[in-house]
């Protein structure tokens, strides 16, 4: 298990100014380092991703953007906004101060809705998806429901759970899934193995 720190408010993306290349560090440096220095299954079949809140948002985007690298995703209360809507509503002056800068193509490359649409066939084939959020998590539930609908419309199979009266609370989220937390990924790893190895 690897628990990387993505910094504050990076959402696990590369900043437009190059100061915070978080996604590149994770994808191009961290994963190869782990696979080179530890006994791993150095492929999608041996790799899962998950996170809570900003970590859930980042995990979701990375899994949808790089479906060849992960066999499962568990997003817990990760806000899933439509980035292109934010870009289109902003003024040029506002865009210049934002993490992703003022180029629409950069935002499109990091918009989870756009990359899910683009990679839908590979996602359907490769990535097992589980999403959970509390019904009292007002700041995140609406976008998570929106993404759930997006996956449904694209025909991407996934497990979607709303936990009654749960707010944005990592400890309570962990308690809710305590008995099955790792079972989900273990099952995903088993399902991802080639048939001859099962």
Which residues make up each language-model segment?
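Non-catalytic cap/lid and distal C-terminal segments of serine-dependent acyl enzymes
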Residues: 1-198
């Amino acid at each position: 298990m690897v628990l990387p720190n993505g910094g504050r408010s990076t959402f696990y993306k590369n900043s437009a100014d190059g100061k915070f290349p978080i996604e590149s560090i994770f994808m191009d440096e961290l994963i190869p380092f782990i696979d080179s220095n530890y006994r791993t299954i150095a492929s999608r079949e041996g790799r899962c991703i998950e996170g809570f809140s900003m970590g859930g948002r980042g995990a979701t985007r990375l899994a949808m953007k790089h479906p060849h690298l992960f066999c499962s995703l568990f997003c817990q209360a990760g806000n899933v906004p439509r980035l292109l809507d934010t870009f289109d509503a902003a003024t040029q002056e506002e865009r210049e101060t934002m993490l992703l800068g003022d180029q629409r193509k950069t935002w499109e490359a990091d918009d989870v809705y756009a990359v899910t649409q683009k990679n839908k066939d590979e996602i359907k084939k490769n990535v097992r998806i589980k999403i959970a959020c509390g019904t009292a998590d007002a700041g995140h539930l609406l976008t998570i429901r929106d993404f759930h609908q997006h996956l449904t419309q694209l025909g991407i199979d996934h497990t979607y759970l709303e936990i009654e009266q749960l707010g944005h609370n990592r400890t309570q989220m962990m308690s809710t899934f305590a008995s099955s937390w790792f079972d989900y990924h273990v099952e995903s790893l088993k399902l991802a193995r080639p048939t001859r190895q099962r």
